[in-house]
A protein has these predicted regions:
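An N-terminal, well-structured beta->alpha segment
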Residues: 1-37
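Glycine-rich phosphate-binding loops that contact phosphosugars or nucleotide phosphates
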Residues: 39-171
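Residue-level signal for alpha-helical context at structural boundaries
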Residues: 30, 49, 78, 181-182, ...
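Catalytic cores of large soluble enzymes that bind and process phosphate-bearing ligands
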Residues: 1-4, 19, 48, 151, ...
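Internal, active-site/partner-interface "lid" segment
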Residues: 128, 142-143, 168-198
Length: 198
């Protein structure tokens, strides 16, 4: 069993190492620019990528930074209304060929929205549509069929959380900002110098 986890860590390490540095730095910069110009960062995904996007949004919001989740499926049923002029959209899709993802990519392009595709596929319909891409490598998903969203979602989580931390730094977020937004639970108590049960 331990061997399985060691193999997973090797896969994740190799995948994270495949992050294209130039594109990553440009993406971070454009996220910061969007926030500084009154825009917001929108993370969009479907299926098992939904909680990954929501975690990123939650981390951003806890720092007082404007981020929203846009479900790839419901976007074209009115939710596109949240996308404004100065926003940036992070579109998560492992294969990039899901009909909903391709459809949303097309509509975002028509609107002139700054869109980034975070994908593990270099050749996909979405990649043909979206100009800005961060293409990642993934050896396998870690299950016996190499089909379940497992390692890919872990990589997305690592990358998006890393992005949130870096964006927070560049936006000058201080611990006091986080403290104001997170008064509850053990974290809130710790920030107030209190014991949770006192």
């Amino acid at each position: 069993m331990i061997t399985y986890y060691e193999n997973v860590m090797d896969v994740l390490r190799e995948s994270v190492s495949s992050i294209p540095v130039e594109e990553y730095e440009r993406l971070i910069g454009e996220c910061v620019d969007a926030l500084q110009n009154g825009g917001k960062i929108i993370a969009s995904g479907l299926g098992k990528n939904v909680p990954i996007c929501e975690k990123f949004v939650g981390t951003m919001n806890s720092m007082g930074l404007d981020a929203r989740f846009l479900h790839t499926n419901t976007a074209v049923h009115g939710d596109l209304g949240m996308v404004m002029k100065n926003d940036i959209v992070l579109l998560l899709s492992k294969g990039g060929n899901t009909i909903e993802t391709v459809t949303l990519a097309n509509y975002l392009k028509e609107r002139g929205t700054n869109t980034w595709l975070l994908t593990f596929s270099k050749n996909s319909k979405s990649a043909e549509i979206v100009d800005n891409k961060m293409e990642l490598f993934l050896e396998n998903e870690g299950d016996e069929w190499d089909i379940m969203p497992n390692n890919s979602t872990s990589v997305y989580l690592i990358i998006l959380q890393g992005m949130a931390v870096e964006i927070g730094k560049r936006m000058g977020v201080q611990l006091e900002d986080f403290k104001v937004n997170h008064p509850g639970g053990g974290i809130g108590a710790k920030l107030r110098g209190e014991n949770l049960w006192n």
